[in-house]
């Protein structure tokens, strides 16, 4: 026989949900214990959020400082990029001025002075990574050479047979293409 005190409409799930509510009503002092714990948890979360915000602000400022320093370094590098080359060119100018200052100069002495000055200039070019391009006898390369004319000649077509003006490369980049005359096949 069913228990007359038990409600037949109450399922075990409803009893489980009702149990915590009944326990909360039965023990009001335990809810007071729970509230300070929630307040303490909230306070700790707010402190942690403030710490994270402060760390984020510091990281953001550091990132901006790094970016600013990098821009300053780039500006300085751009401004003084030619400093090494310029300092290598000063002795060349000094040599030319000294040659012009001598009044009674023989042609041989003048030639010697010009040759020494040319050596200084070539050394300065090499120090700066500027290389001379003299393509005589090489296959024509439109990336490095500028053909002024093409003439019939013996040998393989598209070969440089005369260099009118040397070219220059700065670290493998063309600064000035060589002006050349290129061979073409003889007409049959």
From Swiss-Prot:
Q: Does the keyword Chaperone apply?
A: yes
Q: What is this protein called?
A: Protein GrpE
Query: Is the Cytoplasm keyword given for this protein?
Result: yes
Q: Which InterPro entries match?
A: GrpE, GrpE_coiled_coil, GrpE_head
What Gene Ontology molecular function terms does this protein carry? adenyl-nucleotide exchange factor activity; protein homodimerization activity; protein-folding chaperone binding; unfolded protein binding
Location in or out of the cell = Cytoplasm
Family indicated by similarity: Belongs to the GrpE family.
The subunit structure is: Homodimer.
What keywords tag this UniProt record?
Chaperone, Cytoplasm, Stress response
Cellular component annotations (GO), alphabetically ordered: cytosol
Question: Which stretches of sequence are listed as region Disordered?
Answer: 1-35
Q: Where is the composition biased (Low complexity)?
A: 19-32
């Amino acid at each position: 026989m069913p228990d007359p005190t038990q409600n037949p409409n109450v399922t075990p799930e409803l009893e489980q949900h009702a149990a915590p509510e009944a326990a909360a009503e039965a023990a009001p002092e335990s809810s007071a214990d729970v509230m300070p714990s929630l307040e303490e948890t909230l306070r700790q979360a707010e402190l942690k959020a403030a710490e994270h915000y402060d760390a984020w602000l510091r990281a953001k400022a550091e990132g901006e400082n790094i970016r600013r320093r990098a821009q300053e370094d780039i500006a300085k590098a751009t401004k003084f990029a030619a400093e090494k080359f310029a300092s290598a060119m000063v002795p060349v100018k000094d040599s030319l001025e000294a040659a012009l200052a001598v009044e009674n100069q023989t042609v041989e002495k003048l030639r010697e002075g010009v040759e020494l000055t040319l050596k200084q200039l070539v050394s300065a070019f090499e120090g700066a990574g500027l290389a001379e391009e003299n393509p005589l006898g090489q296959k024509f390369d439109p990336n490095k050479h500028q053909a002024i004319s093409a003439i019939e000649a013996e040998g393989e077509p598209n070969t440089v047979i005369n260099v009118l003006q040397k070219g220059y490369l700065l670290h493998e980049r063309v600064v000035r293409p060589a002006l050349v005359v290129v061979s073409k096949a003889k007409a049959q």
